[in-house]
Amino acid sequence: IERAIVEHNVTLFLLCNPHNPVGRVWTEDELKCLGDICIKHNVIIVSDEIHADFVWDGHTHTVFANLGESYAEHCIVCTAPSKTFNIAGLQVSNVFIPNETLRKRFVKEIDKAGYSQLNTMGLVGCQGAYEVGGPWLDELKVYIQGNIQFTLDYFKQYLPKLRMYRPEGTYLMWFDCSQLPLTADEREQWLLYDAKLWLDSGSMFGKDGETFERINVACPRATLVEGL
């Protein structure tokens, strides 16, 4: 990472934690290592933590700004209630910028772009979701973990040629189709027109993802069973 930052004169690093699509939850040590590199080269880290509420047993989410003052001064943390509470339609998100100078620059730019005003419904919905949505979220997480385990068991029993990875976080599951005798395009055509499934092709995440597919298991179990 450091070599790439230097060679390409990087000034801003986009971090996804928990990671979409592979489901990694970066450890505190990993985040500090990245932070030290970025601080050394004066790189701002934009930490996309939109799936932070979906971190599974044995793993802990660390807010990048909470690593320490020096890390906080070099970061922008982005969250939203849309994934957690399924309210993307309210079009509201949260941007935390501890560095006052950087925050003023950000506010100036969104004012220029015409995005300085939140819609009232979005603001009320966001506040209400975080204030009273905890019990609902607790139940949801149990349900989604059940879907994750069901999917892992199903792939192991019925789809042994497809390697399914257990996510450390998010409700998105990532599986490898490299043992299938199909190109990425052939696989997409088969899934869409024969299986009648519209998954997310790994190709959209770059060349290294061409043999992969992503599936969203945050749905009713009956829907998941039908799709599988």
Model-derived regions, located:
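PLP-dependent enzyme catalytic core of the Aspartate aminotransferase-like
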Residues: 6, 71, 181, 190-199, ...
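A short linear hydrophobic-aromatic micro-motif
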Residues: 152, 161-164, 198-203
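Conserved glycine-rich beta-strand-loop-beta hairpin in the small C-terminal domain of fold type I
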Residues: 120-123, 127, 142-152, 164-177, ...
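A generic structural signal for well-ordered alpha-helical segments
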Residues: 5, 38, 68, 155, ...
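Structural signature of PLP-dependent enzymes
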Residues: 104-111, 129-152, 183-184
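Active-site PLP attachment segment
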Residues: 67-105
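Active-site phosphate-binding strand-loop segment of PLP-dependent enzymes
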Residues: 1-60
